[in-house]
């Protein structure tokens, strides 16, 4: 009988970037098992100038990264809406969300919002309520304080599923 390989848990942080509230969620993925670790959000004061809000987001994420020590990160891609200025500002928050883990030497994956919904719920156009229901099933101990924290957990789950699929494809290919 062949011994089963030991599967080490991988700690993953999901980040849902935003200027008002940047959600974060940390899980551990071990084989098919997902374990809730923590979640929350970084909320810079609205009255700060943009540069200072971006700094507050960076400092908040750096604290979370230092406290939870994830090995991998995933960030939601920005969707382009009709308000070009708002899209550009959100892109700046997303840049900070990608920079913070990179400064800790953590690789960062990116996922489109509909890819996150499809992975977690099974439908690319799922609503926040459907995501919340699936989070309760997949991570029963999680009680996200905001929709942004819930989205961040969904992003982390998406990364866990996609990295597992990638590892399986590499194993089948003999790499």
UniProtKB/Swiss-Prot annotation:
EC category: hydrolase
TM stretches of this protein: none
GO cellular component: cytoplasm; Holliday junction resolvase complex
Residues binding Mg(2+) 2, per UniProt: 76
Binding-site residues, Mg(2+) 1: 16, 148
Active site positions: 16, 76, 148
Cofactor(s) needed by this chain: Mg(2+)
Pfam family name, one: RuvC
A GO molecular function held by the record: magnesium ion binding
Co-factor remark: Binds 2 Mg(2+) ion per subunit.
Claim: Hydrolase is one of the keywords in the record: yes
EC number(s) reported in the record: 3.1.21.10
UniProt keyword Transcription regulation present: no
Catalytic activity: Endonucleolytic cleavage at a junction such as a reciprocal single-stranded crossover between two homologous DNA duplexes (Holliday junction)
Gene Ontology BP, a term: DNA repair
Key words, A-Z: Cytoplasm, DNA damage, DNA recombination, DNA repair, DNA-binding, Endonuclease, Hydrolase, Magnesium, Metal-binding, Nuclease
Protein location: Cytoplasm
Family: Belongs to the RuvC family.
Assembly description: Homodimer which binds Holliday junction (HJ) DNA. The HJ becomes 2-fold symmetrical on binding to RuvC with unstacked arms; it has a different conformation from HJ DNA in complex with RuvA. In the full resolvosome a probable DNA-RuvA(4)-RuvB(12)-RuvC(2) complex forms which resolves the HJ.
Record function comment: The RuvA-RuvB-RuvC complex processes Holliday junction (HJ) DNA during genetic recombination and DNA repair. Endonuclease that resolves HJ intermediates. Cleaves cruciform DNA by making single-stranded nicks across the HJ at symmetrical positions within the homologous arms, yielding a 5'-phosphate and a 3'-hydroxyl group; requires a central core of homology in the junction. The consensus cleavage sequence is 5'-(A/T)TT(C/G)-3'. Cleavage occurs on the 3'-side of the TT dinucleotide at the point of strand exchange.
The protein, known as: Crossover junction endodeoxyribonuclease RuvC
Encoding gene per record: ruvC
